[in-house]
Amino acid sequence: MWENVKKTDPEIYDVILKEWERQEYGLELIASENFASLAVIEAMGSVLTNKYAEGYPGRRYYGGCEWVDVAEKLARDRAKELFNVKYANVQPHSGSQANMGAYFAVSEPGDTIMGMSLSHGGHLTHGASVNFSGRIYNVVPYGVNPETEVIDYDEVRDLALKHKPKIIVAGGSAYSRIIDFKKFREIADEVGAYLIVDMAHFAGLVAAGIYPNPAEYAHIVTSTTHKTLRGPRGGMILTNDNELYKAINKSIFPGIQGGPLMHVIAAKAVCFKEALTDEFKEYQKQVVKNAKTLAAELEKRGLRIVSGGTDTHLMLVDLNPLNVTGKAAEIALGKCHITVNKNTIPNETRSPFIASGIRLGTPALTTRGMKESEMEEIAELIVDVLKHVKDEEGNVDEEIVEKTQKKVKDLCTRFPLYEGKIKL
């Protein structure tokens, strides 16, 4: 598949090969990661990458766009069908740019926005001080109830009434419970705010009908196209309002982007077609079953799951019961070829670079074909490693590392990813 890269640039070929090996023979539990199909990968590697196409289908600033127009129309139409909306912009290069485009469509610098605090499960683009959203806007963060660890809707309403935001953002990157979009819309309407839902993490679950569709309540919905959607890395913006759609289009181009990535848009179209199948719906159901099983098995073995469980593809694990930090856990598990990410938890006492938790997700494991019984095996592996972490640097006895690596490789070999499908 990469013969030309191998001939032209052996160093990059080696990087690709090593990364393929890492994915093929390691357990991927980062909640925001997944494995794209070969059809999606092929579309991304096509000659469509050569075409500049500033503007939108039928209104381009360059000639020769007749075929990329077809690709973009297919992507838009499939996105609209998938999420039951009237309008879709599939040009954002990323979820962050989708959020930026959505914000800029309905607000001005200095306006007040509300978003979930990063330490409570939100995202950088929901108002973090280090992000454009925290630098451009006056940000009022909301969080979870300290006892239940679920969104405190009373607090959201009180803050909205007090600060009168222009935008209320719902969604997050480490929140495992179903969000009440109806309640959010009621609060937004009460204060005259736009409700923007960032469904990047759970878009695949929405597409499969096992998570409420935010488009029924939000003025604007943003998303990535990877994660649970299992497509290429990119973003999109959805709405049912024609005037908002016009503003969104202007906001993306010429507002914050120039030429769209047509090879990625074609891959988005492929991804949406895959997501419209019954097989995809079954896949998403299994993702949630696996997440619930993994959370229960970890809890059974002494770890604490934030909010007591999960309704989605991800969970936030509090490591305090084992007196291990998120940083140490990420390093230790990584040595054993189990990939996770450290994550702050509600009421965090450590810095984000150390953290008290890890975030786990099941989309990538489920793509391999793993089910509940494998989640039990994986929970056992995770806890066994964590119980043997010796220090803040994630050091673990070599005997434990070698034993776990072997078990991980055996498990991955039982559920091959691209092995036999890609010619190396």
UniProtKB/Swiss-Prot annotation:
What cofactor does this one take? pyridoxal 5'-phosphate
One Gene Ontology term from the biological process aspect of the record: glycine biosynthetic process from serine
Please state where this protein is localized.
Cytoplasm
Q: What is its main location?
A: cytoplasm
* EC numbers: 2.1.2.1
Locate the transmembrane regions by residue number: none
List the signal peptide residues: none
What is one term from the GO cellular component aspect held by the record?
A: cytosol
Pathway it works in: One-carbon metabolism; tetrahydrofolate interconversion; Amino-acid biosynthesis; glycine biosynthesis; glycine from L-serine: step 1/1
Indicate where the modification N6-(pyridoxal phosphate)lysine is found in the sequence.
K227
- GO molecular function terms here? glycine hydroxymethyltransferase activity; pyridoxal phosphate binding
Q: Which domain of life is it from?
A: Bacteria
Q: Which CDD domains match?
A: SHMT (cd00378)
UniProt keywords, alphabetically = Amino-acid biosynthesis, Cytoplasm, One-carbon metabolism, Pyridoxal phosphate, Transferase
The residues annotated as site (Plays an important role in substrate specificity) are H226
Instruction: Kindly state which reaction or reactions the protein catalyses.
Output: (6R)-5,10-methylene-5,6,7,8-tetrahydrofolate + glycine + H2O = (6S)-5,6,7,8-tetrahydrofolate + L-serine
User: Which annotated residues bind (6S)-5,6,7,8-tetrahydrofolate?
Assistant: L118, G122, H123, L124, E243, S351, P352, F353
Q: How does it assemble?
A: Homodimer.
Give the protein family. Answer: Belongs to the SHMT family.
Q: What does this protein do?
A: Catalyzes the reversible interconversion of serine and glycine with tetrahydrofolate (THF) serving as the one-carbon carrier. This reaction serves as the major source of one-carbon groups required for the biosynthesis of purines, thymidylate, methionine, and other important biomolecules. Also exhibits THF-independent aldolase activity toward beta-hydroxyamino acids, producing glycine and aldehydes, via a retro-aldol mechanism.
NCBIfam families to which the protein is assigned, alphabetical: PRK00011.1
- PANTHER family attached to this UniProt entry: SERINE HYDROXYMETHYLTRANSFERASE, SERINE HYDROXYMETHYLTRANSFERASE 1
**What name is this protein filed under?**
Serine hydroxymethyltransferase
Output the lineage of the source organism.
Answer: Bacteria, Thermotogati, Thermotogota, Thermotogae, Thermotogales
